[in-house]
Amino acid sequence: MSLKEITKDLHHEAETTIFAKMLLSGKIGKEDYRNYLYNLLAIYDAIEWYCKRQGFLDSMPDLPRLKSIYADFMELDDGTYCYLTPATLEYQAYLHKMGSDPERKHLIKAHLYCRHMGDLFGGQIIKKQVAHISSGKFYDFENADAMKATIRQILTDDLGDEARVAFEYAIKMMKDLYGGQ
């Protein structure tokens, strides 16, 4: 069974959170989008750091999103307060614990799959929907089809449960960003 099939129910749940609906419909405001990017910075920093340490990004030098998320965040920065949601803090701690565990560190690929494949697919819709508030550099990919294929090549059969964990954290974060809903 593919990761897509294993996570299909959670992917649907993530897409149907109120926050995701706001993103996908273009009804998200600048402040909410900025705070979303702020939370993604914490998550992508951990995922990409552990992926780089293990060489998973060597064949995909254009895949890391951290710099482009930061550029989009700074474009919107007005000096007002942003916060990390409880789910983001929990997820960040989880990623660091997992990434530091020699027995489990390879599972970071499941989180790369959840976040980065989502950016390569659904992110293209989001880019159009946030164009009124952001340039959306985060969603700009060189050679996206090749990146999708390369990500698929590094995925292994033992990632199903961990991919579900990644989606569960994504759902929690989006619910936190919209007041727990």
Write out the residue ranges for each language-model feature.
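Metal- and O2-centered redox machinery and metal/ROS homeostasis
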Residues: M1-Q181
